[in-house]
Swiss-Prot record:
Molecular functions (GO terms): D-lactate dehydrogenase activity; NAD binding
UniProt KW NADP keyword: no
Name of this protein: D-lactate dehydrogenase
InterPro entries tied to this protein: D-isomer_2_OHA_DH_cat_dom (IPR006139), D-isomer_DH_CS (IPR029753), D-isomer_DH_CS1 (IPR029752), D-isomer_DH_NAD-bd (IPR006140), NAD(P)-bd_dom_sf (IPR036291)
Active site, renumbered: 235, 264, 296
Amino acid sequence: MTKIMFFGTRDYEKEMALNWGKKNNVEVTTSKELLSSATVDQLKDYDGVTTMQFGKLENDVYPKLESYGIKQIAQRTAGFDMYDLDLAKKHNIVISNVPSYSPETIAEYSVSIALQLVRRFPDIERRVQAHDFTWQAEIMSKPVKNMTVAIIGTGRIGAATAKIYAGFGATITAYDAYPNKDLDFLTYKDSVKEAIKDADIISLHVPANKESYHLFDKTMFDHVKKGAILVNAARGAVINTPDLIDAVNDGTLLGAAIDTYENEAAYFTNDWTNKDIDDKTLLELIEHERILVTPHIAFFSDEAVQNLVEGGLNAALSVINTGTCETRLN
């Protein structure tokens, strides 16, 4: 019987993974550990592996997988910047991802957290906790229908986000290297700077790559409309975090919502209750009154989790049986 290791198992995923194994006549072993130099030897007797990495995979894992006859790694996220695709290819390892698992879920999250900032929820909550129930200009907002929203990246998630904002009646500008002709209700601009210059809300939906690394830094923030709101439910490396904090502090941004952080791997998805966090930048984000931080959780719905579990396992089995899969990256 074919054997697949399901690394990075959350409690709520275990039953889904085992049920998939029964339906597909595959022996699935679940483990809460991640694939790494320390765990790769567990795969000696396996045919395939799926995992949910957050940090960079060590280079010595690829040749070890090859030596064990394993031909793939099925990543259970859309992002894949934790892998060296060229090195994997050199060792005959197919890397795959799950590019679409519930774009609407992430879009809904992106809009809902933006609305918290639009309607000044953090400020209102602090006032109420202090028993200040007055109405003041500082917590007055304006309707989204009178706003311009910039969507940076109009793939599946960005497109879904744009459609929600369109339902509010917002004016929508966008930038994408490959414009979506079906999104005829928005206006594409020739650059990110052009797309954001008049935007009240900026919503990021781009992958992590060389072109997007620290795309939003001090130089980019200099082109932002004063008082804009920035939402990042894409990848942490898209933002230069210290520059973001400066932009909020100096009033360039009214606020920001951050679901991804470039140094999140050690912290996000882990319980750090009653532990010391050494990352001073992360602490500054968390403690900032006008920055909302969530732990890479925008995708987290029952539909998305089911699709990620099955998407990873389906890709692993496809490579085992045919040598490739539809979501292959290298």
